[in-house]
Amino acid sequence: MKKLFVVLVVMPLIYGDNFPCSKLTNRTIGNHWNLIETFLLNYSSRLSPNSDVVLGDYFPTVQPWFNCIHNNSNDLYVTLENLKALYWDYATENSTWNHKQRLNVVVNGYPYSITVTTTRNFNSAEGAIICICKGSPPTTTTESSLTCNWGSECRLNHKFPICPSNSEANCGNMLYGLQWFADAVVAYLHGASYRISFENQWSGTVTLGDMRATTLETAGTLVDLWWFNPVYDVSYYRVNNKNGTTVVSNCTDQCASYVANVFTTQPGGFIPSDFSFNNWFLLTNSSTLVSGKLVTKQPLLVNCLWPVPSFEEAASTFCFEGAGFDQCNGAVLNNTVDVIRFNLNFTTNVQSGKGATVFSLNTTGGVTLEISCYNDTVSDSSFSSYGEIPFGVTDGPRYCYVLYNGTALKYLGTLPPSVKEIAISKWGHFYINGYNFFSTFPIDCISFNLTTGDSDVFWTIAYTSYTEALVQVENTAITKVTYCNSYVNNIKCSQLTANLNNGFYPVSSSEVGFVNKSVVLLPTFYTHTIVNITIGLGMKRSGYGQPIASTLSNITLPMQDNNIDVYCIRSDQFSVYVHSTCKSALWDNVFKRNCTDVLDATAVIKTGTCPFSFDKLNNYLTFNKFCLSLSPVGANCKFDVAARTRANDQVVRSLYVIYEEGDNIVGVPSDNSGLHDLSVLHLDSCTDYNIYGRSGVGIIRQTNRTLLSGLYYTSLSGDLLGFKNVSDGVIYSVTPCDVSAQAAVIDGTIVGAITSINSELLGLTHWTTTPNFYYYSIYNYTNDMTRGTAIDSNDVDCEPVITYSNIGVCKNGALVFINVTHSDGDVQPISTGNVTIPTNFTISVQVEYIQVYTTPVSIDCSRYVCNGNPRCNKLLTQYVSACQTIEQALAVGARLENMEVDSMLFVSENALKLASVEAFNSSETLDPIYKEWPNIGGSWLEGLKYILPSDNSKRKYRSAIEDLLFSKVVTSGLGTVDEDYKRCTGGYDIADLVCAQYYNGIMVLPGVANADKMTMYTASLAGGITLGALGGGAVAIPFAVAVQARLNYVALQTDVLNKNQQILASAFNQAIGNITQSFGKVNDAIHQTSRGLATVAKALAKVQDVVNTQGQALSHLTVQLQNNFQAISSSISDIYNRLDELSADAHVDRLITGRLTALNAFVSQTLTRQAEVRASRQLAKDKVNECVRSQSQRFGFCGNGTHLFSLANAAPNGMIFFHAVLLPTAYETVTAWAGICALDGDRTFGLVVKDVQLTLFRNLDDKFYLTPRTMYQPRVATSSDFVQIEGCDVLFVNATLSDLPSIIPDYIDINQTVQDILENFRPNWTVPELTFDIFNATYLNLTGEIDDLEFRSEKLHNTTVELAILIDNINNTLVNLEWLNRIETYVKWPWYVWLLIGLVVIFCIPLLLFCCCSTGCCGCIGCLGSCCHSICSRRQFENYEPIEKVHIH
């Protein structure tokens, strides 16, 4: 059965001067008290079953509840002050529609304020709204203003129903409320609660507006409407959740103490976040942290919390194993109990005589040790008489001892003045107020006797286990705990903050638990040696009964070469084992008895001065030489041999080591002798490796690469990248077990993560890709257009909450790319027109580069310092906020620069389209009338048709095969003689003479004759000579004719050449002048090109410097990983592999200090560079405005010359400007006049030039002229160019340096100021020496290109000199050809030609007559033929049929 017991507390109401109520009712809530019970039941619903706890908070109280009734008015409101919380309720008794009125609650704060606005729509799902925004909220509203438009950057903008389940029938059963704190706001609405964490300042002032209570009466009384309950202090209620029933009752005694000390354990063993941790201390084995935050492993995971109401006179026993958890408050865990914490709650009064007389510790082996304290020095006989450990404040010093059988084994020290907490671990550590008071062997159970105590005190017993948590400590006590048990909490731990602001955070490396061991060694024949070391301890008691280890304890080494003092390893492998014995003696140093009870001891070998631990020798440590010795002679270092007792460790002997570093000898866990390859590989999983002596943790994967040289391969920082298995030559890669990622956190929740590998992380399963990284998110990228492809900002329509560089993340986890601001309108030129350049000016294009932004850098500090080593990460937390400061400095700098760059850059879509190569190749961007022309890259290719081969169907050339088979002779021909000749001969040599050609009436033959023609004509000549005497000389006629024809060909060809020579000489002499003039222009062009290349080289040098500066810094930062900073190694894994944990921590601490120093230097350099870029960005903005968008009047600002126009283009990390300027090539020297002084009778006046851009000067002809200062254009001055001044006197003011501030108030002598600073700091001022290493990764190396440009510039300059000489030589070169004589010969036809013509005529005329008269069917010849046919005919043969083809098989 549920019950409620309440305490009536009367609290005053504080209100402002304006309280416009016609009637004010102040009374209890009456029969509506069940509202408070319902509220507390909902509030305590988060409590675990089996809970009994006192709740203390700014809860609603029974009274006062107020109701303000006034006439209808919209502009009246009630003001309440100094509130901590406010609750209100709507009374529904006898209410009608006229009674339903609105309410506007305003809680004022800075910069955020809260409003809760309620309408009259009681049955609506959105009848009210809550707003937590920046701004000044209105005190009253209108019926339709259900928005948060009054504010900006709202933390909460949520509409909710007035009544639960959107039903008016449920109204009046739920309280509405607001609580506000410095770091959070809690809102209770329609049965649901909202908690929003953020920092804010609250004034405690609340206004209640729109309470338009009606004046209508129901049953003769005014109807109660809105009731409200102001809360000014904390109220306490007790909630008991047993057997499935929750009972709420009033807390009447020790309420505040119960809230401060008793909590309900949450599921999973977690302590509630609102617990005060009263009297809970940070357990430490060394120094105590006073105040601060750190991530550490502490016993804060509660298996059971047992509240004990008061002490009883009885002995209680608490065991670590098998403890009964039947009285636990809240959740119960079955984990192993590591520490039992006794939390004590007392007043500040002296508590002597109240507490435990003695704590009994049952250690391993059955030995019971007792801890007790005394108020003065005591003797042996009084140790067990009046000892005690008082709980609370003591009235004097207490001296504490460890006792065994009533005998003091060890003096512990003085008890703290006030004992608040005692914690005892199962490993034998005894803590008082967090400090390790005593350590012994492991403990099984604890028991102590309790003295009579008061009933008004209570305490708690917490069975806890170790867990990693972020602990906030103030005045040595724990005040807040954040468990590192989730992804977002891990980020909180790495950032050392319980509340994460919106932003990107590096994901801390997860701890690598137990992993397999991978070993890679060279295959060889191994021999193995087992080294057994026997240590015999001698123990005896002191005069006070304490155990003492005798220095007569002996160490026995194996015998080697009859020597038992030195033992050297002579095999390839060895394993070392230690055997310990213990004997005790009385007073005679004769150790014969077994060690029992407190004399029981175990031999341990500590690190001593060696750079490796004894217990790590079998962990694959390698040496070239290794010897153990009992003598210090020749030793390199020593181990300390100690006897470990229940009280302490006592060093008895030293074991010396002689060693040399190398790989010949290796320590192994077990015998592996013989021919073996002892390599053990665990692929594709996280493994602890030792590869050829290099240790670490990573993932080993097989690759397909082939490398001929090397066994293992490392990075610049010394990290192992891969290795080769010499047996099969396979190359394996070694990568970290996890990689760094950047998590996007919004409102304390991880919504996305940026990573370099495509693998799920942080519980995020949805992903997309970008050109540079993978992005995992809570946003469901299920669209095929976005999943697995580069996401575009248009794919997701949301407003980014956090930004970094050009990316942003929305609240829903979606990733968007932030483009620069877009401008509207088309691209238009600034101006158009023709520019006339004077002859004494030349145009130069000068290149200038200005850096606009830097590439943002994010460094995972813990990854850089510790490389994922878990132990190193714990040590790193001791440096408090070092990593957080470094990471935040880089993140804030990047965000600031991103905002400035975004606000600076604007982009036009059309300009971007024209700047694209693909769009520029498209003819659509050009004039439509030219679209039919071919276009590539913006260059018209119509002219290429004249130089490309055409498709001709007539073959006018021989093939390549024909060129190989025939000899090709090229000669000069006459017109079409050669072509006609070839066509006539058809390739037959005998037709040579027949196909002779005629050119201008002269018979010619081609001048070249092949071998066949020469043979033919030679035979003709020889025959003619031989037969000449016999009358056969006519045979040689063809030879003579052919020779003469070819001679004619040569003569005519010579004539043509003579004409061509005349034409060539005339044209060449005419071209010499043009060539000379052209070379002069080329000379000038090359000179300007040389200067242009020089400016381009300078600009590229700046680009290279900007791009590589950050790379050099990162390279230098990477190189620092090679430094060991006086540690034994730069590898953290190697240090922990060689040393015991305590010694290794000291060396790793040196690495942490050194690497943090390197990181700080890098951050300082980065921030300094960002400051420089910020100034450079402003300069670029000024140059765009003045040089690109307009024409600068400043000489030298937009290029070194008179500015014409400038173009800007993108460049790596900045902008590159192309300035077109006028550079003077000739100068005119004039004497400038400041003005003219004129005399007019007795009056003197002056004239000065009105336009300061003009210069007045007097020319050689004694006339005055005006000319612009930018270009020499003298003109005669006019009266309108001058302004008259009163006189011609020039006044000078003589002043000393001390008088300048009175004349020029803002004058500062910079030189003197700097000189004073240098004088003040010169004694302690030295110049730092900075060294830089060469960066060999992602390095923009333009040195070769710049050198090449400079070389070309110099070469072009030299070319101009050479061209000047060549121009002079060309001017001296004129063609004077010797003319060939032209002989004109008139050739007449010879007599035999005429004779032949006559014979032809005489012969042809009779023949023609005969053919016409005698032929035909009626002619003489026809008749004669018919007669002869009949007489001379022969017998005709028969016609045969054609023979067919016959196939014979």
From Swiss-Prot:
Region feature Heptad repeat 2 (HR2), mapped onto this chain: 1305-1402
Domain of life: Viruses
Coiled-coil residues: 1104-1148, 1338-1380
Region: Interaction with host ANPEP, residue numbers: 657-801
Motif KxHxx, residue numbers: 1445-1449
Gene Ontology BP, a term: fusion of virus membrane with host endosome membrane
Keyword NAD: no
InterPro entries: ALPHA_CORONA_SPIKE, CoV_S1_C, S2_sf_CoV, Spike_S1_CoV, Spike_S2_CoV, Spike_S2_CoV_C, Spike_S2_CoV_HR1, Spike_S2_CoV_HR2
Disulfide bonds: none
Comment field on protein domains: The KxHxx motif seems to function as an ER retrieval signal.
Identification of the protein by name: Spike glycoprotein
Species: Porcine transmissible gastroenteritis coronavirus (strain FS772/70)
Gene: S
